[in-house]
Swiss-Prot record:
Localization (cell): Plastid, Chloroplast
Protein task: Probable thiol-disulfide oxidoreductase that may participate in various redox reactions.
This protein's name: Thioredoxin-like 4, chloroplastic
Short name of one Pfam family: Thioredoxin
Family: Belongs to the thioredoxin family.
Alphabetical list of Gene3D superfamilies matching this protein: Glutaredoxin (3.40.30.10)
Transit peptide location on this chain: 1-27
Active-site residues annotated for this sequence: C119, C122
Domain of life: Eukaryota
Keyword S-adenosyl-L-methionine in record: no
Organism: Arabidopsis thaliana (Mouse-ear cress)
Cystine pairs: C119-C122
Length: 204
């Protein structure tokens, strides 16, 4: 029986976040899966069924200028973080492919956070990533937020991580119309925010 992964969504409102201290080298595109000329994903046919009710929405507007002190204060308070269901966890290639296929119906951007439980930088960016799918926004720019633990229950590299040759985390992938547009490793929420704005603008 095929697995069923339900995705609930909320809305996204961009604003400035904490900057990273110390960069992580960007991971190259995985050419064995993708080509620079836009060849689509070549995973096996999906057997999983994933229900997407609606995409997270992005509100374009002037970014709020918040000081680092204010951001630290906000992170310590219960400031209505996006519910856990907003950032959906997937475990298999089939689940990822199913989301990518369904995202074509709404022209949604799919953002994937690849993480490891024992990774300090992954924990650092997790809250910021959750905040990126919070608050009401513009219905014209749907965004789907996903995450994947690159280490499986046997403390081995996951099938997805092995297939995508993921070597560094936290790593973020940006997909649209089933195509990987960009990937980079970072703990800087502003960089993720900028990529989302770039790929959900009217020109993209």
């Amino acid at each position: 029986m095929s697995s069923l992964l339900n995705i609930s969504h909320c809305s996204y409102h961009g604003y400035s976040g904490l900057t990273s201290r110390g960069g992580i080298n960007t991971v190259e595109n995985h050419r064995w899966v993708w080509h620079n000329n836009g060849v689509r994903l070549s995973f096996p046919r999906a057997e999983s069924s994933i229900n997407i009710t609606m995409g997270c929405t992005l509100q374009r507007g002037i970014a709020k200028s918040l000081s680092q002190e204010n951001l630290v204060e906000l992170s310590d308070e219960n400031d209505d973080l996006c519910p856990v269901e907003c950032v959906t966890e997937f475990k298999t290639d089939d689940e990822l492919l199913s989301v990518l296929e369904k995202s074509k119906e709404t022209n949604s951007l799919v953002v994937v956070d690849f993480y490891r439980t024992a990774c300090g930088s992954c924990k650092y960016i997790e809250q910021g990533f959750s905040k990126l799918c919070k608050q009401s926004g513009d219905q014209e720019a749907p965004v789907i937020f996903l995450k994947h633990n690159v280490v499986d229950e046997y403390d081995e590299q996951s099938e997805v991580a092995e297939r995508l040759r993921i070597k560094a985390v936290p790593l973020f992938h940006f997909y649209k119309n089933g195509v990987l547009l960009e990937s980079f490793a970072t703990r800087d929420k502003e960089r993720i925010d900028a990529a989302i704005l770039k790929y959900t603008s009217s020109e993209s």
